[in-house]
Amino acid sequence: MPIDCKAKCGNKAALKRPKTGDALCKDCFFAAFEAEIHHTIVSSRLFRRGEKVAVAASGGKDSTVLAHVMKLLNERHDYGLDLVLLSIDEGITGYRDDSLETVKQNRDDYQMPLKILSYEELYGWTMDRIVAQIGRSNNCTFCGVFRRQALDRGAKLLGVDSIATGHNADDIAETVLMNILRGDTARLRRCTNIRTGGGEDSIPRVKPLKYSYEKEIVMYAHYKRLVYFSTECVFAPNAYRGHARAFLKDLEKVRPSVIMDIIYSGEQLRFKDTAKKPVRGICERCGFVSSQQPCKACVLLEGLNRGLPKLGIGKKSKGDRMIAQQNQELALRERANLVKNDF
């Protein structure tokens, strides 16, 4: 027998919220979900009136719900924001080409300007070609580095004040686990931050969905009948994040609140002052923000162009040795050709 909505609106409950366990009707769920995101935006002071904000759009559930809710809240609460969609085409046949059609549908549905940038035009490579050269073991490293910089480049072209990404609570909890497993204290410091970047030379990124459960995002998209692309990236199954995700799901079965517990724990972590912090600067080659010289994107790109795809994988010293070895081999070949020509 259907039970009453916990919000006491007079309707029968249609669902149970994964985050709170409350039985709600659809309308009360929508209201609660949207109100929580509004509270996150306001309490964290993510935006200021008059700002231009790029919504990172992939066509997936997270970015589609983010675009929908951002437009809704911007109008409902009069944020005074100028919203645009920014999408990156990685060049993955059978995945990104199809999802971009969904992004274009979002553009039409929400009446937002759309800018699409491709790896091909930015780097001269597509992910299909990169994977053909390097295999599937490190493809997510290349894609992640290039995508982050591509968003920065697109944001700069659009002249926006910030980039809103669709990272949800599950994503952030997974990232905390990944950084703990890797012993990466530098990233562990900032992975729970709702705002990253910013400053004189970079455009800040914000996460309005930071406290929104992935299951609730799916429910919201389903009951709102939003159009989104649900196919997983064809190169994703081998990603390291998948192991953290599976571990998190197992923990969630035992303790339903584990996602928020991990996020709150990550927010409260303290590190010794002696712990090494990355120093952010400007890449001497591309001119974008980086914590190393040259930046990771430029190193990876150099490796691809040199035929040394593993150049940017691992420690910098390893990459330096690979370049030195290649230069030595080239010098030996040139010397051999000179000797041959003398005869």
Curated annotation (Swiss-Prot):
Disulfide bonds: none annotated. It is an enzyme of class 2 (transferase). One of its GO terms (cellular component) is mitochondrion. It comes from the Eukaryota. Keywords: Cytoplasm, RNA-binding, Transferase, tRNA processing, tRNA-binding. InterPro entries: CTU1-like_ATP-bd, CTU1_C, Ncs6/Tuc1/Ctu1, Rossmann-like_a/b/a_fold, TilS/TtcA_N, tRNA_thiolation_TtcA_Ctu1, UPF0021_CS. It is found in: Cytoplasm. CDD domains: CTU1-like. Pathway: tRNA modification; 5-methoxycarbonylmethyl-2-thiouridine-tRNA biosynthesis. Gene3D superfamilies: HUPs. One of its GO terms (molecular function) is tRNA binding. It holds the Pfam family ATP_bind_3. The keyword RNA-binding applies. One of its GO terms (biological process) is tRNA wobble position uridine thiolation. Its EC number is 2.7.7.-. Plays a central role in 2-thiolation of mcm(5)S(2)U at tRNA wobble positions of tRNA(Lys), tRNA(Glu) and tRNA(Gln). Directly binds tRNAs and probably acts by catalyzing adenylation of tRNAs, an intermediate required for 2-thiolation. It is unclear whether it acts as a sulfurtransferase that transfers sulfur from thiocarboxylated URM1 onto the uridine of tRNAs at wobble position. Belongs to the TtcA family. CTU1/NCS6/ATPBD3 subfamily. PANTHER family: ATPASES OF THE PP SUPERFAMILY-RELATED, CYTOPLASMIC TRNA 2-THIOLATION PROTEIN 1. NCBIfam families: TIGR00269 family protein. This is Cytoplasmic tRNA 2-thiolation protein 1. The lineage of its organism: Eukaryota, Metazoa, Ecdysozoa, Arthropoda, Hexapoda.
